[in-house]
């Protein structure tokens, strides 16, 4: 009997699929483990270079002036990200908040934001003010900032000719690495570099801005090493390692990071303020563990993609393709299958496993969304979770997995719940 059946009730045909998937995935697991090892050594070197000490994890209160722990963490982030400077703060509430702070820090009235990889993720629509969303609440467009887009081509690749036409009038070129609610693979660093080169060829002063959410540590380099001036991400995704309880980061050119710090705090204050309270240890430890945790999440993705192919689905990316973020998307086919898959993930979660997810309205989203996340950190997507909008073709987005052993059990239960009901 499979070890899995000592703890969960799987059907024989589902266990047979598990065995086949594990066999097929082994060479792709090894590729990801090589990336993990490289990134972990890079991380270790950055910690050593910074001479971080145990007292740097104690935290500060009040203004947070002269916080050496905060400064060293930002130095480590900058080195690992291939950046000049970084802003790493628990005051960032989410990825969307971090992105908003960065965009407001860079753009002024009359400037143009060019979305070079098509319309951004749903939650940014309200930040920008697209289609009148958030009008009057202080969106970019409320402040006289213009928005332009270069839609992706039919094959979900950037339209480089259109980018070249639109970039001369733009202040910031926005690249979204991950897919949002599109059925495309995340962009690799070569694509990011080509978008950056295309925009700079016609506008040398344009700021290349990359939403790096879900993409950290999936390759051996980061977007700042592929032409980005500024990258932004969330600590409850990849770089927090499942340990950081909140926060976000902005990394890149020193002058641009400083502008973002003025926006987060206040003009004249910049990076000098921001107490860390009791968060430094978790942020240090989470970032240190992040390369290994991301590897576990991608191994989970590879396994899930293989398993889904074996039941006739067409996940993006395929298990045998390059992985540039931790997300897998596939068409569940029906609302029942989408709901069943999410409930299976929830049932094999360490937290709130007894809950049964239901579709519901979510702020920033057009359709009802169903979400499964039995995570230790609310909203964490480096922990095994899945979600999808209740609209045809009922696409499911699966991400995360702190360790492969537990995540494998969750994915297998989700597939059984969606496609092997009695």
Predicted feature residues:
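Conserved PLP-enzyme active-site core in the AAT-like
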Residues: 4-26, 33, 42-56, 65, ...
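Short glycine-rich or small-residue beta-strand-to-loop segments that form or flank ligand, phosphate
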Residues: 60, 87-90, 326-331
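N-terminal small-domain helix-loop-helix segment of the aminotransferase-like
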Residues: 63-69
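Extended, compositionally biased flexible segments
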Residues: 71, 77-82, 90-91
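Conserved C-terminal alpha-helix-loop-beta "cap" of PLP-dependent enzymes
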Residues: 309-421
């Amino acid at each position: 009997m499979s070890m899995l059946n000592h703890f969960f009730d799987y059907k024989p045909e589902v266990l047979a699929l598990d065995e086949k998937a594990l066999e097929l995935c082994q060479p792709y697991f090894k590729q990801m483990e090589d990336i993990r090892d490289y990134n972990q050594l890079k991380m270790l070197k950055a910690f050593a270079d910074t001479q971080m000490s145990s007292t740097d994890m104690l935290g500060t209160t009040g203004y947070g002036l002269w916080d050496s722990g905060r400064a060293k963490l930002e130095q480590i982030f900058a080195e690992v990200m291939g950046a000049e400077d970084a802003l790493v703060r628990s005051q960032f509430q989410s990825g969307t908040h971090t992105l908003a702070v960065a965009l407001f820090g860079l753009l002024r009235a009359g400037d143009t934001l060019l979305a070079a990889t098509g319309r951004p993720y749903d939650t940014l629509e309200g930040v920008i003010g697209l289609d009148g969303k958030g009008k009057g609440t202080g969106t970019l467009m409320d402040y006289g900032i213009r928005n332009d887009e270069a839609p992706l081509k039919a094959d979900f690749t950037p339209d480089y000719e259109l980018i070249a036409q639109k970039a001369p009038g733009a202040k910031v070129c926005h690249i979204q690495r991950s897919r949002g609610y599109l059925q495309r693979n995340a962009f690799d660093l070569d694509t990011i570099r080509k978008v950056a080169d295309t925009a700079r060829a016609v506008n040398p002063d344009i700021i290349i801005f990359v939403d790096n959410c879900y993409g950290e540590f999936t390759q051996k380099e980061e977007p700042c090493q592929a032409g980005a001036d500024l990258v932004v991400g969330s600590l409850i995704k990849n770089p927090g390692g499942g340990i950081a309880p909140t926060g976000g980061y902005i990394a890149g050119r020193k002058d641009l990071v400083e502008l973002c710090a003025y926006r987060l705090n206040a003009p004249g204050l910049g990076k000098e303020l921001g107490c860390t309270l009791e968060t430094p240890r978790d942020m240090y430890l989470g970032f240190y563990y992040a390369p290994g945790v991301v590897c576990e999440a991608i191994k989970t993705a590879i396994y899930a993609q293989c398993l889904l192919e074996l039941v006739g689905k067409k996940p993006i990316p395929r298990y045998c393709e390059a992985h540039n973020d931790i997300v897998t998307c596939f068409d569940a086919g029906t609302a029942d299958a989408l709901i069943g898959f999410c409930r299976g993930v929830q049932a094999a979660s360490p937290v709130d496993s007894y809950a049964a997810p239901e579709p519901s309205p979510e702020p920033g989203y057009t359709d009802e969304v169903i979400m499964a996340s039995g995570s230790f950190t609310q909203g964490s997507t480096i922990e095994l979770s899945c979600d999808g909008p209740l609209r045809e073709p009922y696409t499911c987005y699966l991400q995360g997995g702190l360790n492969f052993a537990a995540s494998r059990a969750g994915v297998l239960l989700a597939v059984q719940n969606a496609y092997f009901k009695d």
